[in-house]
């Protein structure tokens, strides 16, 4: 007898869809979790997986979900599409791949050349079935780029179209245009449902709810009764189109256990009414195109097996084949040795879930529940066969088991078998063959672990409920086992000037700028194409290029919100300061977007940052959204793009470095030039008014890292730099470094350094310079080497250095070469490169003849470090004992200006170096700094 289970009402207290919008007071303020108890309402799969140290089951493990998001269009189909350069003419194109309502097309004639492939939206693109141009007197003309490739295009088309598949006309025109299979199933759609016990009996059911292809069905005639609703995935073999029963000459009767609820004429009237409605609006046959054909079975009556019954998914029982209907269906009954027992039965086919060969439990170490009425303590198949005189079902009768990516402790979403309307967070407790033992989280009444087949259509990947706007039963207080310290942004209400975005057309990826969205938009509309992280592109001042290169090459395809949220999370965690990136992402919005608010989180320095970001929901807005994000982060517009850039970026972004750039898409920056190159250009005097310091949005930090400063050195002066060094620095160092440079890199050299070295110091003797440095050590009370990085335990909190206001010095002094002295000189060999901006040796290493052997050799700069390119910096690092670290400098685009700004905390944090290598590297950097001050800072 079929068992009907009550349908629960949707929960509204622990729904994963409830977001913290943080806009209750109208100014976008986010509040701390320490003052509010939001753990139960704000469930986040990302946080939950991180806190439990678990992983999600891969999406590809859920075959039924993967099929449900497929398009009705198939790769290889032909259609006619308007030419891009001449919309009045058309040409035949081939579908390369699909993503929801987006098609990747290639004009016939390009062969295997992918350079002209382009995306289009089925909803708004000018697409037609093959033959449409002939019927409507339209011109078929090949694109200009290949028009000379063939002399006879008519003959080419005949050969190209012979034996090919054409896109169905109903998918390109009319109400079905651009819709996927699950989008075609609407509320009140009518379907025939096979009886659970009799394969030759059907009854019509009405769809009352469609949740991502999971259908809530109600029997016709019981429209006002919810108690007998059924939940089935649309791919279930029991669902058939209207007319299937009559076509195969089966019976059309309601289930026998429901027949008593209505009078016979009431059932008949309900059936006639349903058939009329089905004839008026039939369900498209495309809904059933992915239904698997049932295979023939080899079972006979009396065969023994082990089975998992649908009404008791907690145990595996011995069972027998009690009836064979035909080559497709047979009946299995759970063994019960009690006299006159009502044995539970179920209708099965060759690929039914939960039927297993004899001894399967023994081989897999699983407990086999003995039949009711069994006298022995431990069930034994050998004794049981002798008593019952029955044969085992051969192994070839059963479906082969194979791994689908499930493993212990993985997370997923699963249907509660006691309440089919409830979907819960589930944990894989055990994997045995093709069966999974799942523990359902968050249930009010504890339940034993349930057993499901890997191919069950009642299990779903992480995020499925959220993607389909359905409530998910979550673990109580799952968001936090203990109070966590989180940092939020409080954005002040202000008028922001619109950010200009330069829109550059891409021939390879043509996405529509806007699309009208009707009520009840189809699910395929929300499918995002594959997005690439082009790590070769310029990463801008916010993002760490080294970390960008370690990210996955692409994300998606999938639902827009999920794909974009994932890629934004990856980008945020690849930033120097994730908090600043989150703040920028909060400003990415457009009033014309169809967007929803999502919470992005990032961890940095032992704290959690979160921000509410608006993410577009439709595929046609993905391109514009990615460009706006890139504009806010001041990186190349192609860093995030549906197009993979393997070689040269069309934006020519490789010319930019972290400290030398002129225009970015969205924000204007001053051209940075070295004073050596602008010495002959008159410039107006710079304002000495200090820029107002931006108010920090961060809370008090833990003293994760500190700068060691000897007693007496003013705050902000790098360790080892004499106090007598002038405050001014050449114009080559910008007056304001981008705010995204990681903490620890000063925004300018400190202005607290007094000017005690005169401008003519470049012409002093080496002995006089040494005396000057000794005087500085006496003033500060510091007697170590002038360029040595102090690593003692005396620590002071890191303070953000003040901006320098006096940046100009006589540029002519910078041109004076250092005075040669009589001493032993060792010139460091360099690698010749035609691309280096600084030619010849970068440095010379000099050791005075009268010095002791323990004294370190002195560094003499042959060129101004402010002019060093990234290649020059890499050359210098390779000449030191830190040569293995040269790759990091190359990856992170560190040029001479950035090199002079590096400090020990910055090197440890941004280059992710341990203390030992970081100290060695800073030692070499300090040598360059001291030499720079002595030779060029006057």
Curated annotation (Swiss-Prot):
InterPro entries per the UniProt record, alphabetical? Mbt (IPR004092), MBT_SFMBT2_rpt1 (IPR047353), MBT_SFMBT2_rpt3 (IPR047354), MBT_SFMBT2_rpt4 (IPR047355), PcG_chromatin_remod_factors (IPR050548), SAM (IPR001660), SAM/pointed_sf (IPR013761), Scm-like-4MBT1/2_SAM (IPR037604)
GO process annotations (BP): negative regulation of gene expression
PROSITE patterns in UniProt: MBT
Cellular-component GO terms for this entry: nucleus
Biased-composition ranges for Polar residues? 13-30
**So which tissues is this one expressed in?**
Expressed in testis and, at much lower levels, in ovary.
Q: Which residue stretches does the UniProt record annotate as biased composition, category Basic and acidic residues? A: 765-777, 809-822
Where does the record place its MBT repeats?
A: 43-143, 151-255, 265-371, 379-475
User: Record keywords: Repeat included?
Assistant: yes
Q: What residue intervals traverse the membrane?
A: none
Q: Which terms in the Gene Ontology molecular function aspect does this entry carry?
A: histone binding; transcription corepressor activity
Please give the residue ranges the record annotates as the region Disordered.
Answer: 1-32, 742-836
The entry's keywords: Nucleus, Repeat, Repressor
State what this protein does.
Answer: Transcriptional repressor of HOXB13 gene.
Q: What else is known?
A: Imprinted gene expressed from the paternal allele in blastocysts and in embryonic tissues early in development. Imprinting is lost in somatic tissues after 7.5 dpc.
Q: How does it assemble?
A: Interacts with YY1. Interacts with methylated histones H3K9me2 and H4K20me2.
Q: Could you identify this protein by its name?
A: Scm-like with four MBT domains protein 2
